[in-house]
Amino acid sequence: MKILAVVGSPRLKGNINYLADQALEEAQELGAETEKIVLSQYEVNPCLGHDDCASFESCLQKDDAGWILDRFREADGVILVTPVYWYNVSAQMKAFIDRNYFLYKHDQKYKARVVGIIVVAEMEAIEDTLHTLKQFIDWSFDVEEDRIFIACGYAHKMGDAKKNLPLVEDARKLGKQMVESLRERS
């Protein structure tokens, strides 16, 4: 079983990356193969909105999004990980979500059987961010509601997530729940 985390934070040592690592570490300890893709380390251009993808099997832009989306297709479980920036997902995560437009145009869905969401905010807008991610999940995955696992909370400065033990535990629990869910329905 393979679980892939896609991280929308540009901070490699920030709170959200730390929590993604916690979830993946727990999943790995339970036997899952894990991978983490930090979007800021790749070239993922924004959607150009030209609608040409309706005529093709994938986006015509030649950047790293195609490779990342292929990894997404192969995963049994996916974790969407983002900080809240200006009341919603980060720009990196938004660009990635928008590049999935071709799925909608071709009435396709990813095969992942479980999805996790990790969101960290400084002080507010977690609900708005969750709404955006759930909308993406609804359009892009054929996953039942009880197979979507969420860990979210608050952390202001770099390193604050490590001190927020309930949030760390929630991230680890998310990794565990994903593995258990994949095992029980395989």
Positions of predicted regions on the chain:
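N-terminal beta1-alpha1-beta2 submodule of the flavodoxin-like/Rossmannoid cofactor-binding fold
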Residues: M1-H106, I150, G159-S186
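Short, glycine-/small-residue-rich phosphate/pyrophosphate-handling segment
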Residues: Q92, K105-A151
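Active-site rim beta-loop-alpha module in soluble metabolic enzymes
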Residues: A155-H156
